[in-house]
C-alpha cells in the first residue's frame, strides 16, 4: 500500500493548471523554473542551503510521500512533529511569495518527507499540467544538467508505468485531493493568488492534526471542512490549532492572514520556540548518549585490560612461587653436594702413603680429561640453550597448562574436604578437634609446593637429553624379484634381541639386531624367513613365549608362527575382511586381539585357536592394543575418527570414547596404564588421559603432537619411556616426548639414484613402520621401498 500511494502521488497527471504560477505582474513560470527560483530564494534566506542537486537527491532517495505519511492509519498526532512539518512548508511557500510567485501546489502529494522529518518539494507528474513525454522532456532540459535530465526522464517513465498499475481508489484519492485543496475563489472562477496558498495551508494544517482511519471517513471529514465544519475531537483536543485553521480557511480571501501575519503570529512562533527548545534538548540528549556510549566503550576496554592485568599478576605470582620452590630445592641439593665433598675429602686425607710423583702424573692426565669433558659439556649446554630458546613459546604453554591443570585438580580435591569439615562444624563438634584433624595446608598451596616440579623437570630434561638421531646400521632386505618391498610392520621380541618385519612381499623376516649393528655391510640376510599366502599387514611377538610370532594379512586371516621351528602353529579365519592390526596381551600371553575392516575386534585364545569374544562396531578397525599391566581392557582406533577404550568384562559399551581426530585413527599405543597416544591421517598424534573422561567421553587431549606429515598412509607408531616415534610421508622419522607437543628429533631417509649415485628427493617414498628396541634409545624404522635403518638417539 505504501509503495502504491507513493508512486501514485508522484506519477498521476491532472489538468488543473498547476504548473503555472500567477503573480501580480501576470507572469507565468514553468514548474521547474519555479523550483529553481525557490531553491535560489532558500539560499538567500538560509532556509536549507539547497542547490540543484538537492532535487536529484530527493528523487534518488526513496523518501515517503507526505500524502502517504498523512494517510498512514497507524499515525498518531505528535504536536511538535506536526508543527515541524507545517513550519517547513510555510517557509517554502513564504520563499516563493517573497519572489512574487504563487505556489498553487501546496498539496501533500507534492511533498516528500525524509526519515528525519525533513520536508522537500518535488516536481511530480501529479503536479503537472501535462503527462506527455514532450513536456517532460522540455522540463528536464531546464534543469541544465545531463545527470538530472537522465534521472528525471527515467523517473517519469517509471512513474507513468506505475500509474497504469495503480488501483482506481488511489487515483480517486489524488483527484479528491485536488478538490480538497482548491479555494472558494478558485471554485468561483477567480485566478489563484497568495491567499489561495494560505487557504491550502489551512487544509494541510487540518490534515496534520486530524488523522483519519478510513478513506470513507476521510472523504466525509474533508467535505465538511469545505463548510468550515470541524470534527468534535479536533475542537476538543486541539482548540488553538482548530481556531487558527478556521482563520486560514476563511471563505473571504481578504479575511485570511497574509504570509507576514502568519509568520509573526504567536501560533507559529511559540511552537517554533518550543520546537527549538525540544531540538536543543534532543541534541543534548544525543550528546549525552554519545558520551555514555564512549564511556561504556572505555569501561569495557578497561575491564578487559584489568582482567588481563589480573591474569598477568596471577601468572607472575605463580612464577615467583615456583622460582622460590626451585631455588629452595637447589639450595638443598647444593648443601648435600657440600656434605658429600667434605666426606670424600676427609677420606682422602687418610691416604697419606700415596706417592707424590704418581699423583702428579695422574693429576696431569685427569686435567686433560677434565678439559675434554668441559668442552663437551659446554657444547652440550649451548645446544640445549639453543633448542630451549627456539621452542620457548611452546615450552611455556606446556608449563602453564601443566600448572593450571594441577591447580584445578587440587581445587577439586579441596571441595569435598571443605564440605566434610563444614558438616563437622554443623554437627557441633569442637572447633579445636576440627582444627587438629584438618590439614594445615591448603591443597592449592600444596600443589604449589613442588608437586609439579619433578614431572615437568623430567620431561624437560628428556626433551633436551638428545641432540640427533644417528644411524647405527643400514639394512637393505628387499627382494630383487619383488616389485614391492613395503614394510607394513616391525616388532621386537621380549628381550630386544631379534626383530621381525612383515609387508606386502608376503614374508616374515627375522633379524638379529646386534649382528646387524656390528656388521658394517649393507646387505643382511634374515636368520629366519616365513612365507605367507597373502600380503601381511601386522606382526606381534608373544611377551612370554619368546619364539612365538603372530601375524595378520590382507585376506582377514590371523596366523601364529613358531620361529624356532620355522612353521605355522595355528590359523584363525573368522574375520570377513582384511585384518589391519594384532596385539598380544602382556599380562595374559594366551590372549590375542585383532582389528579388521569388517568393523569387528576379535579376542583369540591361542590355545583354543578360536575367538572367545567379539566387539562389533560400525566402522573399520585400524589398530588394537592391550595395556601392558592387564589383559582385561583394550584400546582400538577406528575409521570413524575415534579411539575406543573397553573393559573386556563388559564389551557392550566402551568405557571411554576419545573424540578429537578429524580423520581415520591408524594407530594407538599405551604410554602408561592411564595414558595412550593415537595417530591419525589428520597429521597429528594426540595424547589422552583415560582418567579425564566425563560420562565416558573425552574430547580434550593432553597434547596434540604436530610436525610430521601424514594424510593418507600408515606411517607407524611406537612408544618407549615417554618417547613417541612416528613416521612421515616426507620419508622422515620423528621423535616426540609425551611432555611436549613439538618434535624432539627427526631423521630423513636419503634416496640415492642407482645410476648417478646422487641423493635425490623422491616424494613417493614414506616411512611405513617404526619400532623401539624395548626401553632403549635405539629405534628401527623402515620405509616404503623396504629400506630399514637402525637409529639411535645421541
From Swiss-Prot:
<feature type="short sequence motif" description="DWD box">
    <location>
        <begin position="635"/>
        <end position="649"/>
    </location>
</feature>
<keyword id="KW-0833">Ubl conjugation pathway</keyword>
<feature type="repeat" description="WD 2">
    <location>
        <begin position="531"/>
        <end position="571"/>
    </location>
</feature>
<feature type="region of interest" description="Disordered">
    <location>
        <begin position="352"/>
        <end position="373"/>
    </location>
</feature>
<keyword id="KW-0808">Transferase</keyword>
<dbReference type="InterPro" id="IPR020472">
    <property type="entry name" value="G-protein_beta_WD-40_rep"/>
</dbReference>
<feature type="region of interest" description="Disordered">
    <location>
        <begin position="428"/>
        <end position="447"/>
    </location>
</feature>
<feature type="domain" description="Protein kinase">
    <location>
        <begin position="1"/>
        <end position="268"/>
    </location>
</feature>
<keyword id="KW-0539">Nucleus</keyword>
<dbReference type="GO" id="GO:0005524">
    <property type="term" value="F:ATP binding"/>
</dbReference>
<comment type="function">
    <text>Repressor of photomorphogenesis in the light. Probably part of the COP1/SPA E3 ubiquitin-protein ligase complex.</text>
</comment>
<dbReference type="GO" id="GO:0009637">
    <property type="term" value="P:response to blue light"/>
</dbReference>
<keyword id="KW-0853">WD repeat</keyword>
<feature type="repeat" description="WD 4">
    <location>
        <begin position="616"/>
        <end position="656"/>
    </location>
</feature>
<dbReference type="InterPro" id="IPR015943">
    <property type="entry name" value="WD40/YVTN_repeat-like_dom_sf"/>
</dbReference>
<feature type="compositionally biased region" description="Acidic residues">
    <location>
        <begin position="358"/>
        <end position="369"/>
    </location>
</feature>
<dbReference type="InterPro" id="IPR019775">
    <property type="entry name" value="WD40_repeat_CS"/>
</dbReference>
<dbReference type="InterPro" id="IPR001680">
    <property type="entry name" value="WD40_rpt"/>
</dbReference>
<dbReference type="GO" id="GO:0042802">
    <property type="term" value="F:identical protein binding"/>
</dbReference>
<feature type="compositionally biased region" description="Basic and acidic residues">
    <location>
        <begin position="136"/>
        <end position="165"/>
    </location>
</feature>
<feature type="repeat" description="WD 5">
    <location>
        <begin position="660"/>
        <end position="698"/>
    </location>
</feature>
<dbReference type="InterPro" id="IPR036322">
    <property type="entry name" value="WD40_repeat_dom_sf"/>
</dbReference>
<dbReference type="InterPro" id="IPR044630">
    <property type="entry name" value="SPA1/2/3/4"/>
</dbReference>
<dbReference type="InterPro" id="IPR000719">
    <property type="entry name" value="Prot_kinase_dom"/>
</dbReference>
<dbReference type="GO" id="GO:0009640">
    <property type="term" value="P:photomorphogenesis"/>
</dbReference>
<dbReference type="GO" id="GO:0004672">
    <property type="term" value="F:protein kinase activity"/>
</dbReference>
<feature type="repeat" description="WD 7">
    <location>
        <begin position="762"/>
        <end position="794"/>
    </location>
</feature>
<keyword id="KW-0677">Repeat</keyword>
<dbReference type="InterPro" id="IPR011009">
    <property type="entry name" value="Kinase-like_dom_sf"/>
</dbReference>
<feature type="repeat" description="WD 1">
    <location>
        <begin position="482"/>
        <end position="521"/>
    </location>
</feature>
<keyword id="KW-0607">Phytochrome signaling pathway</keyword>
<dbReference type="Pfam" id="PF00400">
    <property type="entry name" value="WD40"/>
</dbReference>
<keyword id="KW-0547">Nucleotide-binding</keyword>
<feature type="repeat" description="WD 6">
    <location>
        <begin position="707"/>
        <end position="746"/>
    </location>
</feature>
<feature type="coiled-coil region">
    <location>
        <begin position="272"/>
        <end position="326"/>
    </location>
</feature>
<comment type="subunit">
    <text>Interacts with COP1 and CO. Binds to CRY1 in response to blue light, this interaction prevents SPA1/COP1 complex formation and thus avoid COP1-dependent degradation of the transcription factor HY5 by the proteasome and promotes hypocotyl elongation.</text>
</comment>
<feature type="repeat" description="WD 3">
    <location>
        <begin position="574"/>
        <end position="614"/>
    </location>
</feature>
<dbReference type="GO" id="GO:0080008">
    <property type="term" value="C:Cul4-RING E3 ubiquitin ligase complex"/>
</dbReference>
<dbReference type="GO" id="GO:0009585">
    <property type="term" value="P:red, far-red light phototransduction"/>
</dbReference>
<dbReference type="GO" id="GO:0005634">
    <property type="term" value="C:nucleus"/>
</dbReference>
<feature type="region of interest" description="Disordered">
    <location>
        <begin position="126"/>
        <end position="165"/>
    </location>
</feature>
<keyword id="KW-0175">Coiled coil</keyword>
